[in-house]
């Protein structure tokens, strides 16, 4: 599967607005995102829509949601449910490496989940004293997943809170190296890796030559950081950036333009 030149940039953004000409031959693209000046790039703790969308280029989950809203294996190679539907066994792909060269193992999946649970602060009854805004982006995972265990380096068994195929939707969170789950800018497994970050200014990404899938068509991505959506759209209007992420109500102002076009896509929350 070759990632398209637009979907490869922002796999889950609410809306893309792009210039109509000149992108196909480009080796780099610039995108406007809205984020705080003091943003920490910790993918399990983010709550900035634009940044989460951007970092879907850097990180991958066990499963991803396809265009038909169905979960499909990503870092997972295979999966199977127990007869009673209360457990699901997931086998990892054996050709996955993080950007730091480390091979993906089940220990990384377990450590990622352990840290997510720590952030959420849930007890056995899913009670938590942690404010919702501070529980991390993926705390709802634990409404479906009760416990997890690595049975070997390539296999994880998940115990579910209820028998449901829908539990696979909960396994789309990004997998991080066990040693970097709480780190800033941890290594990922995706088609792009970090090339730099200046708070309040920009995030730079470069193509991951060691990616397990076919290489992306765009080599470099610069994400310029703006305080507001209006500032981001103004940057697009003045051609300071190639892409602006925004909601459809804002994109409608470009509907009659011959120099731009819009692409609508789902976020992790299935917004449009």
Feature annotation, model-predicted:
Residues 27-35, 87-90, 109-112, 156-158, ...:
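Short, well-ordered beta-strand elements
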Residues 80, 91, 126-179:
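Surface-exposed binding/hinge segments that line
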Residues 93, 206-209, 262-272:
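A bilobed periplasmic-binding-protein/Venus flytrap-type ligand-binding module shared by bacterial periplasmic
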């Amino acid at each position: 599967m070759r990632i398209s030149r637009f979907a490869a940039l922002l796999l889950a953004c609410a809306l893309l607005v792009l210039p109509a000409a000149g992108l196909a031959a480009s080796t780099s693209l610039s995108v406007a995102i809205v984020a705080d000046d003091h943003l920490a790039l910790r993918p399990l703790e983010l709550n900035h829509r634009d940044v989460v969308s951007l970092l879907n280029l850097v990180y991958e989950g066990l499963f991803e949601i396809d265009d038909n809203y169905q979960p499909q294996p990503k870092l997972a190679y295979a999966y199977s449910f127990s007869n009673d539907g209360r457990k699901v066994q997931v086998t990892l792909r054996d050709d996955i490496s993080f950007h730091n060269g480390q091979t993906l193992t089940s220990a990384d999946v377990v450590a990622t989940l352990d840290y997510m649970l720590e952030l959420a602060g849930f007890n056995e009854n899913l009670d938590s004293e942690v404010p919702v805004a501070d529980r991390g982006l993926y705390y709802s995972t634990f409404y479906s997943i009760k416990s997890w265990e690595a049975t070997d380096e390539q296999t994880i068994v998940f115990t579910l809170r209820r028998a449901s195929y829908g539990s696979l939707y909960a396994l789309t969170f990004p997998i991080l190296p066990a040693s970097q789950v709480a780190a800033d800018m941890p290594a990922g497994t995706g088609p792009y890796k970090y090339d730099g970050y200046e708070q309040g200014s920009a995030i730079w990404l470069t193509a991951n030559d060691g990616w397990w899938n076919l290489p992306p068509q765009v080599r470099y991505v610069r994400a310029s950081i703006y305080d507001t959506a209006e500032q981001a759209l103004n940057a697009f209007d003045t051609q300071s950036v190639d892409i602006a992420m925004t909601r459809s109500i804002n994109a409608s102002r470009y509907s009659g333009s011959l120099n731009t076009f819009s692409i609508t896509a789902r976020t992790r929350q299935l917004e449009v």
